[in-house]
Amino acid sequence: MIPGEYHVKPGQIALNTGRATCRVVVENHGDRPIQVGSHYHFAEVNPALKFDRQQVTGYRLNIPAGTAVRFEPGQKREVELVAFAGHRAVFGFRGEVMGPLEANDE
């Protein structure tokens, strides 16, 4: 074994099985590319990305951990989002939630 080496089973790994998902069309109205990471609370992404933010509160991109999606200026694309799990509390990012997601549903 080499230090840091991974030994994984052959085949596919199912991610986020059984979690709530949604699809949303996002358009970059800015003049620069915007990249969003896998675990960023999607409702709090750069304001130049236009979409229904209320619909995606409590969701993140449904992509493998450590990856990202890039939105070029003027680009419109549909993305799939997956609900946050666990304690469902969001802290940081743009500071718009700062606590349990359910407390912000009102």
Swiss-Prot record:
Pathways involved: Nitrogen metabolism; urea degradation; CO(2) and NH(3) from urea (urease route): step 1/1
Pfam families: Urease_beta (PF00699)
Top-rank taxon: Bacteria
Keywords from the named record: Cytoplasm, Hydrolase
Listed InterPro entries: Urease_beta-like (IPR002019), Urease_betasu_sf (IPR036461), Urease_subunit (IPR050069)
Molecular function GO terms recorded: urease activity
Location in or out of the cell: Cytoplasm
Record-level GO cellular component terms: urease complex
EC number: 3.5.1.5
Signal peptide stretch: none
Gene Ontology biological-process entries: urea catabolic process
Recorded family membership: Belongs to the urease beta subunit family.
Classification via HAMAP family: Urease_beta
Subunit: Heterotrimer of UreA (gamma), UreB (beta) and UreC (alpha) subunits. Three heterotrimers associate to form the active enzyme.
Protein name from the UniProt record: Urease subunit beta
Organism (species): Klebsiella pneumoniae (strain 342)
